[in-house]
C-alpha cells in the first residue's frame, strides 16, 4: 500500500493521520479510518485492473473508438494527489479532445482533495453534477 499510495499524504504534512490526502475534512478522514470497509490493503486484482485501465485509456486507438458525441464530465479536487492536483485530470480531458470527443467539461474544486463527494462543500459538487446532467438529458415532462 505504501508503495502505491505512500506519497499522497506528503503535501499535507505535518500529517494528522495516514489518510489526510482523502479529504480536507477531518471528520470525513476520521469516518474513513473508522469504517472497516475502507482503507484495506488493495488486492493484486485491483492493481491488475487499474493498470489495464491506465494502459487502455492511454492507447490512442482506444480513445478514438469512443463516440465523439457522448458528453464527458471530469470532476476533481484541486488538491487531489491522485489526479496530480488537477494536472492528470487536465491531461485526460486533453487526450479525449485530441481523440475527437466534442463535449468535455472539466471542473476542479479548490480546497478539495480526493473524496469530493464527502467534503464539507460537497453540495457544490452535487449541484454542479445535477446541473450538468439536466443540460444533457432529455426532459421527462409528462
Q: Residue spans of the language-model regions?
A:
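Alpha/beta-hydrolase-fold enzymes
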Residues: 1-37
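Active-site nucleophile elbow and catalytic-triad environment of alpha/beta-hydrolase enzymes
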Residues: 43-64
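Conserved alpha/beta-hydrolase "acid-adjacent" motif
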Residues: 81-91
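Short beta-strand/loop motif that positions the catalytic acidic residue
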Residues: 74-76
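Catalytic active-site module of serine/aspartate enzymes centered on a nucleophile-bearing elbow/loop
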Residues: 57, 99-142
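Alpha-helical elements of Rossmann-like donor-binding domains used by nucleotide-donor carbohydrate transfer enzymes
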Residues: 31, 49-52, 91, 124, ...
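Short, conserved loop/helix-junction motifs that constitute active-site signature segments
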Residues: 63-68, 99-101
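Acidic beta-to-alpha connecting loop that harbors the catalytic carboxylate
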Residues: 78-81, 112-113
Amino acid at each position: 500500500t505504501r508503495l502505491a499510495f505512500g506519497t499522497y499524504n506528503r503535501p499535507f504534512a505535518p500529517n494528522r493521520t495516514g489518510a489526510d490526502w482523502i479529504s480536507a475534512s477531518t471528520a470525513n478522514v476520521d469516518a474513513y479510518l473508522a469504517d472497516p470497509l475502507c482503507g484495506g490493503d488493495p488486492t493484486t486484482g485491483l492493481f491488475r485492473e487499474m493498470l489495464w485501465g491506465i494502459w487502455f485509456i492511454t492507447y490512442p486507438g482506444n480513445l478514438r473508438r469512443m463516440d465523439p458525441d457522448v458528453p464527458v464530465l471530469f470532476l476533481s479536487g484541486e488538491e487531489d494527489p491522485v489526479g496530480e492536483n488537477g494536472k492528470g485530470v487536465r491531461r485526460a480531458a486533453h487526450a479525449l479532445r485530441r481523440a475527437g470527443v466534442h463535449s468535455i467539461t472539466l471542473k476542479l474544486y479548490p480546497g478539495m482533495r480526493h473524496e469530493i463527494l464527502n467534503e464539507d462543500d460537497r453540495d457544490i459538487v452535487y449541484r454542479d453534477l445535477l446541473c450538468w446532467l439536466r443540460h444533457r438529458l432529455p426532459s421527462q415532462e409528462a
